[in-house]
Amino acid sequence: MRDVRVEIMADGASKLFGENKLSRPVESLSEAELYEIAALEEKLRSCVGAKAGPFLAWDSVNRAMIRHWCEAMGDNNPAYSDPAVAAVMGTPAGAVIAPPTMMQAWTMTGFGGQHPPGSDTREQNPAMRHFAEHGYLAVVATNCEQEYAQPICEGDKLSGYSTIEFVSERKTTALGVGYFVTQLTEYRNQHDEVVGTMRFRILKYKPLLPL
């Protein structure tokens, strides 16, 4: 199957986020502020390239969850409900395929915040802890890029492996001063085959107004 790449952009993101690196010129920041920035950025650099995983799915890919997703999204593609149509994609006999955009849903923790036994117990994104320690408490998602390598079939059991791929320089935005963080997650099936990847970008920032 040919790789497919999809980018999902948060509405108005290009308007929200500016290009300036600092909220004030460097020379107007106090020595204490500069020290704090340097300390945070040293911690962030140590996080780039950090890998964690596997993070296992609680459930195998199943038709009920596919149906719920499709109903919520208004997606009536017959390959997601009719095994005969899905068979054209090379699925096992009697199986349907899952919407590729649903890829990340299978390994999410849910409200309990826990992954199944056998999952990596390390932080998926240790940079988040460092941001909180330095007062960058607000977060907004900016965009998501997904690439699909092969169909996700009913009965598959997915796992995710995450890497902090990039942390930007300190930026000034209309929301506040912060950093853009890109996290790359690779999704594999029970045969250790890559089914797709997702790059998820967020802005961690100090809000202009109190939370």
Predicted regions and their residues:
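A generic "cationic amphipathic patch" detector
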Residues: 82, 159, 175-177, 198, ...
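Generic structural detector for well-ordered beta-strands
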Residues: 60, 147, 201-203
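Short, low-complexity, polar/charged sequence segments that are solvent-exposed and flexible
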Residues: 115-116, 122-125, 165, 179-183, ...
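Surface-exposed, gly/pro-biased binding rims or lids
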Residues: 188-211
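Hydrophobic beta-sheet segments that form the core/acyl-binding groove
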Residues: 142-189
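Hot-dog-fold acyl-thioester-processing enzymes
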Residues: 2-143, 211
